[in-house]
Amino acid sequence: MGNSESQYTFQGSKNHSNTVTGAKQKPCSLKIRSVHAKDEKSLHGWTHGSSGAGYKSRSLARSCLSHFKNHQPYATRLSGPTCKVSKGTTYSKHRANTPGNDFQGNSGAFLPENGFHYVDRESEESHITSNGHLLTCYGRKESLASTPPGEDHRSPRVLIKTLGKLDGCLRVEFHNGGNPHKGTSEDPSGPVRLLRYSPTLASETCPVRETRRHSAAGSPSSQRPSPTDSRLRSSKGSSLSSESSWYDSPWGNAGEVSEVEGSFLAPSTPDPSLPSSFPPSDTKKPFNQSSSLSSLRELYKDPNLGCRSPSGTCLSSNEYISSQVSLNNRVSFASDMDVPSRVDHRDPLHYSSFTLPCRKSKALTEDAAKKDTLKARMRRFSDWTGSLSRKKRKLQEPRSMEGSEYFDSHSDGLNAEGQVPAQTSSLLWSGGSAQTLPHRSESTHAISVDPLRQNIYENFMRELEMSRSNTEHVETSTETMESSSESVSSLEQLDLLFEKEQGVVRKAGWLFFKPLVTLQKERKLELVARRKWKQYWVTLKGCTLLFYETYGKNSTEQNSAPRCALFAEDSIVQSVPEHPKKEHVFCLSNSCGDVYLFQATSQTDLENWVTAIHSACASLFAKKHGKEDTVRLLKSQTRSLLQKIDMDSKMKKMAELQLSVVSDPKNRKAIENQIRQWEQNLEKFHMDLFRMRCYLASLQGGELPNPKSLLAATSRPSKLALGRLGVLSVSSFHALVCSRDDSTLRKRTLSLTQRGKSKKGIFSSLKGLDTLARKGREKRASITQMFDSSHSHGFLGTQLPQKSTNSNKAHDLHLYGSAVDSALRDSMWEVQTYVHFQDNEGVTVTIKPEHRVEDVLALVCKMRQLEPTHYGLQLRKVVDKSVEWCVPALYEYMQEQVYDEIEVFPLSVYDVQLTKTGDMTDFGFAVTVQVDEHQHLNRIFISDVLPDSLAYGGGLRKGNEITSLNGEPVSDLDIQQMEALFSEKSVGLTLVARPVTTRRTLCASWSDSDLFSRDQKSLPPSPNQSQLLEEFLDNFRKTATSDFSNVPEITTGLKRSQTEGTLDQVPHREKMEQTFLSADQIAELCRDLNNTHTNSMEAPTESHDPPPRPLARHLSDADRLRKVIQELVDTEKSYVKDLSCLFELYLEPLQNETFLTQDEMESLFGSLPEMLEFQKVFLETLEDAISASSDFSVLETPSQFRKLLFSLGGSFLYYADHFKLYSGFCANHIKVQRVLERAKTDKAFKAFLDARNPTKQHSSTLESYLIKPVQRVLKYPLLLKELVSLTDHESEEHYHLTEALKAMEKVASHINEMQKIYEDYGMVFDQLVAEQSGTEKEVTELSMGELLMHSTVSWLNPFLSLGKARKDIELTVFVFKRAVILVYKENCKLKKKLPSNSRPAHNSADLDPFKFRWLIPISALQVRLGNTAGTENNSTWELIHTKSEIEGRPETIFQLCCSDSENKTSIVKVIRSILRENFRRHIKCELPLEKTCKDRLVPLKNRVPVSAKLASSRSLKGLRTSSSSEWPSEPSKGNSLDSDECSLSSGTQSSGCPVAESRRDSKSTELEKDAQEGLAEFPDGLIKESDILSDEDEDFHHPLKQGSPTKDIEIQFQRLKISEESDVHPVGQQPLTESGEQPKLVRGHFCPIKRKANSTKRGRGTLLKAQTRHQSLDSHPETASIDLNLVLEREFSVQSLTSVVNEEGFYETQSHGKS
């Protein structure tokens, strides 16, 4: 029924007139329920100011059918009358058009919760209005005082009759329960009548949602049995809405006995007061409807009544709606349906106090037909209510005999057992306070105490009288008013939190609940100490779970907040089928780091909850992103996360590779920190990906993703943390990931709050974080401020505090998951700390929140009478049984530090004298200064030192502090004096060796005049001191401000405005300029101010992080571009210098030593010579690009950088494939580690390394040098990305740079691919090289940098040793520059089927997956086209090993078949190109490839054009239309691979690592010309068919063009004769011929412009013409060449024809002499 309840009082109570304030309720003999002491209110505290909250009485047994209550939790009645209920037959569906006043028979449901009002049948005109609702009462018109106590000790029976099937009419009759043969005391002749209520939409009294449905509309009214039918049964504490589904609850027509007080049998004689509408025949029909306790509870409730005499009784209507509270639809409305059931006959029962309709737990026979009908109609409501089935109850209810435990949310409950109350008192509630939880008694034989009985009708009248009298005492209780206003205020906060997302109720039902994991202090996950299952009515509104103690609330209880609320934002819900004791358990983890367990009623209900919560989270996620298409957004996020995972995985792998060769502890620590950060990033990305897939599954109806892939991504530290926690699951992992997020802390501060007069305790999880906001750089309120502003506390997933009206004491927060930190955490954060000194002494200091590290150091030193500048402070922390030391920066706050001990240590002080000699222009170090407002220096720090400079040799190191200059203390100098001293030829410094801070914590500045670079990170100063000086001076000229109040908060670097503001105050600019022009070192300061970014792990040039974006307030877009470009060039210079040092220090001396073998040398330095030469060329192109832009330093808009950006982007596009040289070096890095391990055991090797690095600097070690190429190649995409971000997205240069960025990212992918291949097959490659027969190995090493192509082919003629039954064995073909390797790797699935006698060609263990491996050196390799006899397959080809000795034959033929003809074409071309290359090399020098590579260390003399032939998209289009034969600058080269090796359209083949796709795109006629030039040098007899096959032959679909091999040879001999005449001088000294002939520049890669398809293949006549034209170009007069250069530069930004580089990156003239 409705929301009315009666407050039962004990008759004869000693305190029947008043209640002692604050007295605790004595517990009853049974654990009826737990009542909070703070729930007891004053008797006189009830006024209309309660905002309609009223007192809240709760049913003892929640056998409620009515789910129409909105919010209000109910308190149990401790005493009350006996009542008997007759059950009606059917429910009616609400209909807006139902007539208002007609009774349709006697089978309509006249429910008080539907808005029916109680009317005495004597006078319908006599009524009162309370809160605007009609209330008419009869027979009891006297006031509260006129009701004599104890007038009738018998509780009346309440008979409820359904008067109509469809229109919802009901009659309630009151009968005296003591004598069944006697009518009611007021009207023996008839029952009390109810006023007819019309459930229309226009009803002004009850705007309850229409969720009723016909349950048995077709049942005749004659099916109703008598209310005293013997089939009435008692219940053992069950509740339909909480225990069973609608369709499986066998409700009988028994009078239902209270769970708490027990049942008392009564005579079974028929009630004489039954009206004639109940015929005797009704007794044989089953019920279609039952009246639930909640329905009766509505009958006995008054929201405005506060006190009553114990002797009186009150009854209130359910429709007292406070005029101050609007309708609240927050809670889901479950349907009030029951199931018709047929029950066995048994003796009727007496009704005692607390007796209300309940059902017995006895299994009953049901009418199958009726039940099935209802099942079909009601099944859809079962999930909505979420009720537990009857048969699951015993299994699932935790510790059912201790009901008060699972629902008692406070510690002061009524928990005494076996006690009969010695005294009685009325429990009084204030608005919003009576939120204790319901409780079930497990016995039907509860004790009945006679004085507890009351007259329900008298209660009803008392409540009416009290409600009238309360209107006169509104102003009498200020405490009540205060409480009421606070309730309203809390309600407003509640509405703000929940209505802001316009959430709707998605799901509601009963759930058992307990917290599992919570986030404690120091962001630690801990298991919740107090873990008991509790049951709540849970509604999912929006993305928030609201927990109520009872269900089905309506608008009467709007201001009654939910018991708790849980934000489910970004949550993950997972089923927990492995729970040891319970079924249908699921786990919810939210973004706040909390984990909760829930138990649903069934598996279906569980799945519905999971889907509902995930769908709500997905909806909120889409709203946050402003998207309407949630599915599309989630898919987009999924793709983005996959890309991030891929990128971070690669970066982490490279960092691990770097870590393996670094031995310096500090650098290792930095790398490990970076790896740990990448691991955490990957975990977060994997978690977000899993979450997105969960949301997608909920929206699309799919299965949830498998958590195995997520848990596999857990890093080792995370596994250890979860192992300590004892819970390794998706939910705990999610909580761990969320606990690292700073936003988690902010989210935890948002919650449902209720106003309290004083501050509550803050969660212990927030200890130490309260004053976080006082750091100047973070502009967000502190936790304390947040609470102070709302005057309240409350947190996610926690029980809300309650406010007592008669007590001003602050109430403790009762928390799920963490104890209360009851100590008030105000802004005064002070800690007593003992500080140690190295002399085993120490002092105790008080550290305040505003103290920085330097403040504590100064305080400690002052106490010990020491000089603070000569001491440092370090922190000791114990982590996993190891001790970590950390030196924080002086400007960091002590409150932010995590430590176990503080130690002060002395700094080393030493003097250095630096003197410049010869043409030395500077000392080689940079400084940063701290100045005061008078331009006097406070401190000077060394910000950078060049490695080979005078300063470095003198012992200066980054981070040292200069305390005196030439004997003058720094504090006595100003800027001009400092500049003058640094400009002298000699300077004496007193230095304090201050350690570099070990972490980079962002912080606020020291002071307004602080110039110290926070991170102490800077780029090396540029060698061009004059440019720096000009920029430095410009800074002083442009900016003149000393107002620091407008300086924005800075997240990194230092405030440049401070520098400008202080330095600009120096007068006499002309004099200042003269001083600065003579101070070379001060120019370094500018670089340090502008460039504060370097790698914390290695040399300052190699950082994996993108350069920081300068502050918009200080740098324009042009300045940013200039800064990034300058950084690119500067770091490139430093990198080339490092590579040169590697050669000078290690490579060249090692060649003269004997402790490394040739193979080990190859491993260490395999492709480094080529890499160095290439990097020199690349550096020249970058420098030329900048030098060509003479106004680079004065460009003011990004558009003016257009030409320069095209040149830079073109350089990257042109050389993209050259960077693939790094793939071999990176893949071989595993070998490098093995070689360097020898230094630990080989004393000679170790002595050599020590001699190379006498100062023991890690940056000068061999490991450090060998890791620099790995770092550098990963740096390029980051710099390009920064350039791309600074250009206009619609501009051509933006597109151009984007293409360059893509090319470099492909390089990184290629390097990773090569590493993967080496990991899989490197062992095979090394083994094949080692197993070569013969005294001198033809192939000494196979470098991944020389891998040109790999492909999978079918082997058509496998060896017999592999088994005759094997068909189409899959071979992997690896084409290297020096050899071709065939490998058969057996599939693991096929191992079992392999015959026992099968062995690979090379005998190996059965466990070896490589069943066949074969190496064919390039000198013994032939390739043959053609189909196998009798087949039409044109994808077959043959590899021939000509010098094979197997099976007694001179050659071994491998018949292979590719997947398609295109793949065949690609691989055959690559093999032929290496054959031709080997042939030419043999002609020229007859040296093996590896020897020529080692000798080729001559630097390149010419370089690529600045623009790399890519000017703009317009010229790109123009070039695409031009014929390749008209391209003037494509001479062939003599020592590189042929062009059909398929270099990228924008790259070269120098790396030897082309990709198949580009192979098919890049076709040219220069292959034939190259082949002809090479063949001309050989006699006929030495020429093989496989060596002279042209591209026409390769294009096997067409017949041979005109000409023959003989004719080709004749042509070559003619050319050879001409070449001999010109080749008079040795290489490198050829003078110009009379015709001005230039040395030929060879080039193996092509212009990045793709030719048209019809211009790729030409006949031999065309080749001869092209050859003649090329020769004529070479012999052109110089003026003609200049004219052509001008045309090229104007049209294509090509500076000269001679600035083309061959494929290997070397300058070589064509040598045509005889070998």
Curated annotation (Swiss-Prot):
Residues 1-27, 174-249, 263-294, 385-418, 1092-1113, 1515-1582 are annotated as: Disordered. Residues 395-411, 1557-1572 have a biased composition (Basic and acidic residues). Residues 831-902 form the RBD domain. One of its GO terms (biological process) is small GTPase-mediated signal transduction. Signal peptide: none annotated. The modification Phosphothreonine is found at residue 1662. Residues 911-997 form the PDZ domain. Residues 504-618, 1347-1478 form the PH domain. The keyword Cytoplasm applies. This is Rho guanine nucleotide exchange factor TIAM2. Expressed in fetal brain (at protein level). Expressed in the olfactory bulb, cortical plate of the cerebral cortex, caudate putamen, hippocampus, ependymal cells of the lateral surface of the lateral ventricles of the brain. Weakly expressed in heart, lung, liver, skeletal muscle, kidney and testis. It comes from Mus musculus (Mouse). InterPro entries: DBL_dom_sf (IPR035899), DH_dom (IPR000219), GDS_CDC24_CS (IPR001331), PDZ (IPR001478), PDZ_sf (IPR036034), PH-like_dom_sf (IPR011993), PH_domain (IPR001849), PH_Tiam1/2 (IPR055230). Pfam families: PDZ (PF00595), PH (PF00169), PH_Tiam1 (PF23014), RhoGEF (PF00621), Tiam_CC_Ex (PF18385). Residues 235-245, 1522-1532 have a biased composition (Low complexity). The PH 1 domain and amino acids 619-780 (a region called TSS; otherwise known as CC-Ex) are necessary for membrane localization. PH 1 and TSS domains are necessary for Rac1 activity. The PH 2 domain is engaged in the enhancement of the catalytic activity of the adjacent DH domain. The PH 1, TSS and DH domains are necessary to induce neurite-like structure. Residues 665-692 form a coiled coil. GO terms for molecular function: GTPase activator activity; guanyl-nucleotide exchange factor activity. The gene is Tiam2.
